[in-house]
């Protein structure tokens, strides 16, 4: 459940599972789309629920893995209702970001809706503009619309999270970025550079390299920015997932059998 691993042109930058990992278990929604396709969280919710309906007939236990919190929430709890917004608001925000930069919009969102500011990927201009246009158009914080009753699904879920000390997470991120560069991320980004305005490419790892290609960053600075923004994104991911008090958290070094045992216990309780 990774909102960027859908796209087949973004293999290296999204750390798509290796072929042996994909062969170990059947995967869905991995590189099944093109960056040129229009695909949003609502469409994913629909497609995932349709796929689950089929898969549950084969096995009552299915596993969803990934770090895109909004997409996970869409499948488990349904999407929130948001009011229609005057397109002129989006046009004004686009003009502002072009003239003054994303930092101005980040500051505005922080003032209008601190809760959303703390949770979303604030380096993603589309996410920032979406939250702001709702705040401005409705006169109500974007987060208010997200605090509605959850939709009822015809399945139960058990949520599991793996965590580690911040220093370990950040070191892993730095190593992962270095590995991506060694594996050809710069070359992959070059093949997508002509289409850098696409929503799918407003992504850490590509956005910084596009600035390098534009001549705004040196190669070394672009790589350091990828690391910094990846660390920032990881911090926000943890903030997002830790909102849910029902998640079972384990240290990343916890023995697999221990995790399996606790999960099995939870499953058995659901059967009672």
Model-derived features: where do they sit?
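Phosphate/pyrophosphate-binding catalytic cores of soluble transferases and nucleic-acid-acting enzymes
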Residues: 1-272
């Amino acid at each position: 459940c990774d909102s960027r691993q859908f796209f087949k042109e973004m293999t290296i930058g999204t750390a798509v599972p290796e072929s042996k990992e994909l062969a170990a278990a059947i995967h869905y929604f991995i590189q099944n789309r093109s960056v040129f396709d229009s695909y949003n969280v609502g469409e994913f919710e629909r497609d995932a629920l349709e796929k689950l309906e089929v898969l549950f007939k084969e096995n009552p236990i299915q596993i969803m893995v990934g770090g895109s919190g909004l997409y996970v929430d869409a499948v488990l709890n349904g999407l929130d209702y948001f009011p229609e917004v005057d397109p002129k608001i989006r046009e004004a925000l686009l003009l502002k970001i072009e003239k003054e930069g994303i930092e101005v919009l980040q500051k505005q969102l922080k003032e209008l809706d601190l809760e959303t500011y703390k949770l979303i990927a604030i380096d993603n201009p589309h996410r920032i503009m979406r939250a702001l246009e709702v705040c401005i158009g409705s006169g109500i914080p974007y987060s208010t619309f997200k605090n509605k009753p959850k939709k009822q699904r015809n399945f139960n879920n058990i949520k599991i999270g793996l965590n580690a000390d911040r220093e370990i997470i950040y070191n892993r991120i730095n190593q992962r970025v270095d590995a991506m560069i060694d594996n050809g991320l710069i070359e992959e980004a070059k093949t997508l550079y002509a289409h850098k305005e696409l929503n799918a490419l407003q992504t850490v790892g590509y956005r910084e390299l596009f600035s390098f290609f534009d001549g705004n960053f040196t190669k070394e600075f672009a790589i350091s920015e990828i690391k910094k923004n990846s660390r920032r994104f990881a911090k926000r991911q943890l903030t997002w997932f830790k909102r849910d008090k029902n998640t079972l958290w384990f240290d990343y070094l916890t023995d697999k059998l221990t995790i399996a045992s606790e999960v099995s216990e939870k499953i058995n309780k659901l059967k009672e």
